[in-house]
From Swiss-Prot:
It comes from Streptococcus gordonii (strain Challis / ATCC 35105 / BCRC 15272 / CH1 / DL1 / V288). Transmembrane segments: none annotated. Binds the lower part of the 30S subunit head. Binds mRNA in the 70S ribosome, positioning it for translation. Part of the 30S ribosomal subunit. Forms a tight complex with proteins S10 and S14. It comes from the Bacteria. One of its GO terms (biological process) is translation. InterPro entries: KH_dom, KH_dom-like_a/b, KH_dom_type_2, KH_sf_prok-type, Ribosomal_S3_C_sf, Ribosomal_uS3_bac-typ, Ribosomal_uS3_C, Ribosomal_uS3_CS. SUPFAM superfamilies: Prokaryotic type KH domain (KH-domain type II) (SSF54814), Ribosomal protein S3 C-terminal domain (SSF54821). This is Small ribosomal subunit protein uS3. The gene is rpsC.
Length: 217
């Protein structure tokens, strides 16, 4: 049986950057667990704020957290109340000074996390899994994607035997390293158990900068 490598992990260092930007030796395990705690806490606190990527950078006793969100107004709150409260909670959680950057996602229909989250929430509201996937595919293609593939797995329609069913449109070249492919996996809690939702979105190629070869250099 063929197995697929993680599309983002395969491209890190080529066309993708790391989500955690820090270096440590003896403190590596502590920092890693702290990163996981920060991500879990932020995702829980901002479950309805359409947060996609969480980037973490570290300096001496300082943590910079960058939140990529489609709803920056909801994250910031009136007069910055929500982001101040979040910062205070993260300061208490980590025992360090936390700085929060909020980055708006201009095209949420081209973000695999947000598309997958949308499908998962529809499944929880008992929308037919085929309809949820096809509507998401149409929105993503209209937003300018070159291709999209979705897959829902589990007890579909309450069936006794779990299975997977997916749809695709356009092209999704998983083997092309210069292809900008966004991937995400989400869960939907239904009355029949959990359903897994996978989304691959091909947004075009990222070509490396052309080197200047003038003069034979």
């Amino acid at each position: 049986m063929g197995q697929k490598v993680h599309p983002i992990g395969m491209r890190v260092g080529i066309i993708r950057d790391w989500d955690a930007k820090w270096y440590a030796e003896k403190e590596y395990a502590d920092y890693l667990h702290e990163d996981l705690a920060i991500r879990k806490f932020v995702q829980k606190e901002l479950a309805d704020a359409a947060v996609s990527t969480i980037e973490i950078e570290r300096a001496v006793n300082k943590v910079n957290v960058s939140l990529h969100t489609a709803k920056p107004g909801m994250v910031i709150g009136k007069g910055g109340a929500n982001v101040d409260a979040l910062r205070a909670k993260l300061n208490k959680l980590t025992g360090k000074q936390v700085h929060i950057n909020i980055i708006e996602i201009k095209s949420p229909d081209l973000d695999a996390h947000l598309v997958g989250e949308g499908i998962a929430r529809q499944l929880e509201q008992r929308v037919a899994f085929r309809r949820a996937q096809k509507q998401a595919i149409q929105r993503t293609m209209r937003a300018g994607a070159k291709g999209i593939k979705t897959q829902v797995s589990g007890r579909l329609n309450g069936a006794d035997i779990a299975r997977s069913e997916g749809y695709s449109e356009g092209t999704v070249p998983l083997h092309t390293l210069r292809a900008d492919i966004d991937y995400a996996w989400e869960e939907a809690d239904t009355t029949y158990g959990k359903l897994g939702v996978k989304v691959w979105i091909y947004r075009g190629e990222i070509l490396p900068a052309r080197k200047n070869t003038k003069g034979g250099k």
